[in-house]
Curated annotation (Swiss-Prot):
Keywords: Metal-binding, Zinc
GO BP annotations listed: regulation of DNA-templated transcription
Designated name of the protein: DNA gyrase inhibitor YacG
Statement: the UniProt record of this protein carries the keyword Cell inner membrane: no
Disordered: annotated segments: 45-66
Family: Belongs to the DNA gyrase inhibitor YacG family.
Pfam families the record matches: YacG
InterPro entries linked: DNA_gyrase_inhibitor_YacG (IPR005584), Znf_NHR/GATA (IPR013088)
Quaternary state and interactors: Interacts with GyrB.
Listed cofactors: Zn(2+)
Domain of life: Bacteria
TM region positions: none
Length: 66
């Protein structure tokens, strides 16, 4: 039988078995998953892109709501 794939938890670095048995993958625990979610919510993580503001991106695209 082959060895299960192991990855590092993105939050704490602990080894994590990548399998259907691990409901938190790629995280080692619910705690690490929630820490990562909190970091995204606090805008500590960002997806690379241009620095255009939302107003510039969407101005004139939609009719104003009344």
């Amino acid at each position: 039988m082959s060895q299960p794939l192991t990855v590092d938890c993105p939050t704490c670095g602990a080894p994590v078995e990548w399998s259907e048995k691990n409901a938190f993958r790629p995280f080692c625990s619910d705690r690490c998953k929630l820490i990562d979610l909190g970091a995204w919510a606090a805008e500590e993580h960002k997806i690379a892109g241009s620095e255009e503001s939302e107003d510039e991106l969407y101005s004139g695209d939609l009719e104003p709501r009344h």
